Regions:
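Short, internal acidic amphipathic alpha-helical interface segments
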Residues: 82-123
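Well-ordered alpha/beta subsegment
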Residues: 111-141, 145
């Protein structure tokens, strides 16, 4: 009888663990909402990727000044969603000279942040905060359009600064 009770307890614990795993994460809910919005509005060219359990992303491209730039929409379990555009890869010599101009851009456009990642890529990041129940995929895609408009205006000046040094 004691073994029977123990077996039932183990089965109940296993059932609880399974239920917890089935519960959809906030990141997955955000990604699903973005995919449904993109499908409903016939937005193509999107690749859905899972980096790990916490970070999911949409990989796409932006055409700016004749260049095809990688754009990632990163969702996770935090209140933030990130737009990350990878603009150019710098050599070691170009990094120091470019940082000053990137700081100027950061001061001019507070909602955007230019940085250089460890691989030497100049990355433009746009953070979009939204509470769990306030996530709006339409806003995310509208901000992708704003990011593209910003790059259409400022990308050539950035590239001139980089290649002139």
């Amino acid at each position: 009888m004691a073994e029977e009770i123990k077996d039932n307890e183990v089965k109940e614990e296993a059932a609880e663990v399974t239920e917890a795993k089935v519960e959809e994460t906030l990141a997955m809910k955000k990604l699903t909402a973005l995919k449904e919005f993109a499908d409903a509005h016939e937005i193509g060219g999107l690749q859905y990727l899972q980096i790990n359990e916490e970070n999911l992303l949409i990989n796409t491209r932006l055409l700016v000044e004749g260049q095809t730039l990688p754009l990632f929409i990163v969702v996770n379990n935090s209140v933030y969603t990130y737009l990350q555009a990878h603009l150019v890869t710098l050599t070691e010599e170009k990094k120091a000279a470019t940082l000053s101009y990137l700081n100027e851009l950061n001061n001019e456009f507070n909602m955007l942040k230019y940085s250089i990642n460890p691989q030497g890529n100049v990355v433009l990041i746009f953070s979009i905060p939204a509470g769990d129940d306030k996530f709006d995929p339409a806003l995310v895609f509208a901000l992708v359009d704003q990011l593209k408009a910003h790059l259409d205006t400022h990308y050539s000046a950035l590239m001139e600064k980089i290649w002139s040094k």
